């Protein structure tokens, strides 16, 4: 089990992160002892998340909340009130953070994990050709 550190903006997603980490570990995958998760703003309009692997016991995952297209709509005031991370992006970056999938991009092991997540949890994490496409 890893120690999870979230910045203030990511705290609203803590239950999703904890569940996703547990789900991936239940499939037989491992994480580094320290997972740092925080948000970043505007380095790229295309990047939803990025995972950095360090030579110590640390893995850093950054999420760009602003680049996600899942909008929170407030029907009381009839306006978009915020943007949320998608669950599939959370699982996608956590898949890259596993010991088994890191440094291999969207290769064979990532594809295997994607298929397991899709089959078990019905979440398509994207990024690799799936047997279900």
Where are these regions (language model features)?
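Active-site-proximal or metal-binding-adjacent scaffold patches in catalytic folds
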Residues: 1-88, 97-133
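Walker B catalytic acidic pair
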Residues: 93
């Amino acid at each position: 089990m890893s120690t999870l550190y979230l910045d203030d903006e990511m705290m609203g997603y803590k239950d999703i992160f904890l569940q996703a980490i547990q789900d991936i570990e239940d499939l037989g995958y491992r994480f580094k002892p320290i997972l740092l998760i925080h948000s970043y703003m505007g380095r790229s309009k295309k990047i939803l998340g990025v995972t950095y692997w360090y030579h110590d016991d640390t893995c850093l995952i950054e999420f760009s909340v602003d680049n996600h297209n899942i909008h929170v709509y407030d029907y009381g005031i009839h306006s978009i009130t915020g943007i949320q991370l998608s669950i599939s992006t959370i699982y996608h970056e956590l898949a890259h953070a596993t010991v088994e999938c890191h440094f291999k991009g969207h290769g064979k092991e990532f594809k295997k994990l994607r298929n397991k997540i899709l089959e078990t949890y019905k979440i398509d994490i994207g990024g690799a050709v799936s047997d279900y496409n």
